[in-house]
A protein has these predicted regions:
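Generic short beta-strand
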Residues: 50, 111-112
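Glyoxalase I/VOC metalloenzyme domain signal
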Residues: 1-45, 53-103, 115-131
Length: 131
């Protein structure tokens, strides 16, 4: 095709970032992540266990890994979704309507902590009220 990888440093080639979310019941959490990220399914692949993509093609793809047993310890990472302050309320409402729960709004206007049905956390953040 005539495409060439242009290194950005020693030994550097192409890098692609994806987010993988472990889940016991993928169809129960996928709608939450679709709503909170404002993502879509790939054309022709929008089933209950299919990956999600950023419709603007700027953010990483999100895919779901089937787990056989729950993991009792707390997640060691979480996702921050930064949105314009005037979109935060509607993004949170969409995520809650899609099965999410509000974990904390103690720092509301700066960020809210939400979780999907299996406890995977995401913070919806804005620039307001930052320290």
């Amino acid at each position: 095709l005539g495409l060439e990888t242009v290194p950005r440093g020693p030994g550097r080639s192409v890098q692609k970032l994806e987010l993988a979310i472990d889940a016991m019941d993928i169809p129960s959490i996928r709608p939450f992540w679709k709503a909170v990220l404002a993502y879509t399914g790939e054309p022709g692949y929008d089933g209950p266990t299919d990956p999600l993509i950023d419709p603007t093609r700027e953010g990483p793809a999100v895919w779901f890994q089937q787990m056989d047993q729950p993991r009792p310890q707390r997640n060691r990472i979480h996702v921050d979704v930064s949105v314009p302050h005037d979109e935060a309320d509607s993004r949170i409402a969409s995520a809650l309507a899609a099965g999410g729960t509000l974990v904390s709004d103690r720092r509301a206007r700066a960020f809210w902590v939400l979780a999907d049905a299996e406890g995977n956390e995401v913070c919806v953040t804005t620039w307001q009220d930052r320290d």
